[in-house]
Amino acid sequence: GAWRFPGAWPDANFNLAHLKTLIRKLEAAKFDAFFMADHMAVLNMPMAALKRSHTVTSFEPFTLLSALSQVTAHIGLIATASTTFDAPYHIARRFASLDHISNGRAGWNIVTTSNPDAALNFGHDEQMDHDERYRRAREFYEVVTGLWDSFADDAFVRDVESGVYFDPARMHTLGHKDEYLSVRGPLNIARPVQGWLLSGLAGDGAGGRVRLRPPARRGSGGSDFHGRQSLARRAALLRRHQGPRGQGARAGRR
């Protein structure tokens, strides 16, 4: 792997000092964002290959990006988070916290986790099938964005004289109950700086087209991450994704 190249840092993905230097250079070079992949299990590959892979150890994304936010000011910080092996309340809190800590620079790479070994790490005997994972992902995203809308932007008045910290009329309880998830709310964190965060997903399968509604503030929106493809293929994917996203757009709670 690349960790063996002459002059490379063998522990580059697990060395905080190196990552701080790297992200400062990326920001100075005007990169838009720092994207951090994540895995919910050690990758399923033959041991002969695995023993040569740097992927067996890496930082948890939210912890690392929170640290990197303190040595940068402008670059976006995109964390990978699974909708299959986590709870939407946890995810909503983590991203809201990261967005406040970074002053509105957080982003969410949505994944459904295809590695079957991940299921064994979270109390399941087998992986949820592909289509079901994406149905859950759609509902999961709706819950997370709903939780981000728990408080209006002006809810926290913090009036010292009256002793009123927030306006109850500006708080919204989600009360979600559907096929996969039951979440009452509200979130116990103020609305993210961006309102709804920049969110995106990888892949181009029919099941993977999760409808992403654009956030309400700062011009953030949805993104789709794809591998190397022909120009015609990319154009077709763009047309396919733009339709559902445009139809599903709405403003967030204000």
Task: Go through each PLM region and give its residues.
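N-terminal beta1-alpha1-beta2 module of alpha/beta enzyme domains
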Residues: 1-71, 196-197, 214-215
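Glycine- and acidic
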Residues: 3-8, 48-50, 76-81, 218-228
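Glycine-rich anion/phosphate-binding loops
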Residues: 11-18, 83-97
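Short amphipathic alpha-helices and their capping/turn segments at secondary-structure boundaries
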Residues: 19-29, 95-99, 238, 242-248
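Acidic (Asp/Glu)-rich catalytic clusters
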Residues: 27-28, 65-73, 99-105, 246-252
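Hydrophobic faces of well-ordered beta-strands that scaffold small-molecule active sites
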Residues: 34-36, 75-81, 104-110, 197-202, ...
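Aromatic/His-enriched, Gly/Pro-containing loop or helix-boundary segments
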Residues: 57-64, 68, 75-88, 128-131
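Internal, glycine-rich beta/alpha segment that forms the wall or movable "lid"
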Residues: 87, 92-216, 231, 235, ...
